[in-house]
Amino acid sequence: MAAVTTDLIRELRERTSAGMMDCKKALEENNADIEKAITWLREKGIAKAAKKAGRETKEGRVVSYIHGNGKIGVLVELNSETDFVSKNEDFEALGKEICMQIAAMNPLYLNEESIPAADLEKEKTIMRSQLEAEGKKADQIEKILPGKIKKYISEVCLVNQAFFKDDSKTIDDLVKEAIAKFGENITIARFIRFQVGGL
């Protein structure tokens, strides 16, 4: 298998506007062949989604979900560029899927950028202390820490979480698929989860 270099990832990003991890995965799946990787990204709708990601989303709807036992409720603000899309049944279905994800997986934040710096530092300190307690040396800790932080982010940030119905994709991937399908930008603006007797 050919090596996936940072130069190849950079070139693919420049040519498709797709995210770094999407480009890396596309190259890995296609033996570092950039043309095949572009086709792969297009088939997945990622290249198209990335080009639309900068567009403003002023329309949308609030989608709600109450879990079967009546003890968990979720509200999600899902935005689109036009009301034509936000009134679509498939858009509503996407909102329901995201609500069920939140009910099931209880994310604390929307995305990595919404984690307060103090909270992230606190987690890093805890992780560092755990690794020290396991007898890891300082240089080992610095190599292990980024992976542990990435795992933490994938657990607590909605868009980074594995989709509960198909863990081969994230919620971000689910939204990108919808962007490709509808042909316009879609964003999750915010969410709130209620639980009887909980926070």
Curated annotation (Swiss-Prot):
Residues 82-85 are annotated as: Involved in Mg(2+) ion dislocation from EF-Tu. PROSITE patterns: EF_TS_1, EF_TS_2. GO terms for cellular component: cytoplasm. It comes from the Bacteria. CDD domains: UBA_EF-Ts (cd14275). It is found in: Cytoplasm. Keywords: Cytoplasm, Elongation factor, Protein biosynthesis. Gene3D superfamilies: 1.10.286.20, DNA helicase RuvA subunit, C-terminal domain, Elongation factor Ts, dimerisation domain. It holds the Pfam family EF_TS. Its main location: cytoplasm. GO terms for molecular function: translation elongation factor activity. Associates with the EF-Tu.GDP complex and induces the exchange of GDP to GTP. It remains bound to the aminoacyl-tRNA.EF-Tu.GTP complex up to the GTP hydrolysis stage on the ribosome. Belongs to the EF-Ts family. This is Elongation factor Ts. It comes from Leptospira interrogans serogroup Icterohaemorrhagiae serovar copenhageni (strain Fiocruz L1-130). The lineage of its organism: Bacteria, Pseudomonadati, Spirochaetota, Spirochaetia, Leptospirales.
